[in-house]
Design a protein with these regions (language model features):
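Hydrophobic anchor residue at the start of the ABC signature
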Residues: 146
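Conserved ABC ATPase "signature" region
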Residues: 109-127
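ABC ATPase NBD coupling module
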Residues: 65-79, 103, 108-109
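Short helical segment in ABC ATPase nucleotide-binding domains corresponding to the A-loop/adjacent helical element
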Residues: 94-102, 112, 116
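A short, proline-enriched helix->beta-strand linker immediately N-terminal to the Walker B motif
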Residues: 151-155
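Conserved ABC ATPase signature
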Residues: 132-136, 140-142
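Helix-to-loop junction immediately C-terminal to a conserved catalytic motif
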Residues: 49
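Catalytic Walker B motif of ABC-type/P-loop ATPase nucleotide-binding domains
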Residues: 157-161
Length: 270
């Protein structure tokens, strides 16, 4: 479990990026921080692996304050996926994925074998192993980023807008694959996005973040959609948007789901 206990972060120039924030990420669950730009999501995420240290308050992993841990070892024990992929451009795919296992002491052949297995895990062909990142599509690069983060079998995965830079169709399939992967791997995932639909698709629990990391609401996707705590959340989630107000229509004996404007979006299965 990851626990944020009254955490504040003040950068050098003044107003707090994050002010007195407390929440937990239960083990084996996916918690998604969603909020507008500059609300402090990345700051919160980076406090888990000590890329940022809190000005006050504590971040605990399984009851241990992360500031008592060696930052380098801590970072090697936590998977981290960034929007840009963060792959080393002059290393091949397999080398990129093998980095952390190597740093953790695996022999070169073992680390390579592990990296190839990770390619299978994230649904990439082993033929891509010797390519360089620039020779991959955006979606493939993000899969490699996920493979690299998982390569040392960390308990915790931090994901900062990992699918933000790919087109909507690839993004959907990456989200779907992450959910499938999570079903079997059961990692503790803290995921940051500004896209509420991505949060609804991925989260066991969503935390809607307002300015300065203030938590506007925490709940399951269903709770957030059906019982927004206040006007800010309702507006952010877009509870009144036509695609959130689904209706049923009958089309020659088949129940068709339409949005509020009557546009068909699917059929109902019972
Ligand atoms: N290294 C830094 N030095 C000074 N201010 C910073 C630094 N990093 C972030 N900030 C400020 O802290 C606030 C929160 O930034 P943060 O990146 O955590 O927000 P975010 O919610 O992740 O935003 P985005 O969705 O745009 O990535 C912003 O006002 C930002 O300008």
């Amino acid at each position: 479990m990851i626990e944020f206990d009254r955490v504040t972060k003040r950068y050098a120039d003044g107003s707090p990026a994050v002010a007195d924030v407390s929440f937990t990420v239960p083990s084996h669950k996916t918690v998604v921080l969603v909020g507008s730009s500059g609300s402090g999501k990345t700051t919160l995420l980076r406090m888990v692996n000590r890329m940022v240290d809190p000005t006050s308050g504590r971040v605990l992993i399984d009851d241990v304050d992360v500031t008592t841990m060696d930052p380098v070892r801590l970072r090697r024990s936590i998977g981290y996926v960034l929007q840009s992929g963060g792959l080393l451009p002059h290393r091949t795919v397999v080398e990129n994925i093998a980095i952390v296992p190597r740093l953790n002491g695996a022999t070169r052949p073992d680390a390579r074998e592990r990296a190839l297995t990770m390619l299978d895990t994230v649904g990439l062909d082993r033929d891509l192993a010797s390519r360089f990142p620039a020779q991959l599509s955006g979606g493939q690069q993000q899969r490699v980023g996920v493979a690299r983060a998982l390569a040392s079998d960390p308990n915790i995965l931090l994901m900062d807008e990992p699918f933000g830079a790919v087109d909507p169709i690839v993004r959907r399939s990456l989200q779907h694959e992450l959910r499938e992967l999570q079903r079997t791997l059961g990692k503790t995932i803290l995921f940051v996005t500004h896209d509420i639909d991505e949060a609804l698709a991925l989260a066991d629990e969503i935390i809607i973040v307002a300015a300065h990391g203030v938590i506007a609401q925490r709940g399951t996707p269903t709770e957030i959609l059906t019982r927004p705590a206040n006007a800010f959340v309702a507006e952010f989630v877009g509870v009144d948007r036509p695609e959130r107000r689904l209706r049923l229509a009958d089309a020659a004996g088949v129940e068709v789901v339409t949005d509020a404007s009557g546009r068909p979006i699917g059929t109902l299965e019972r």
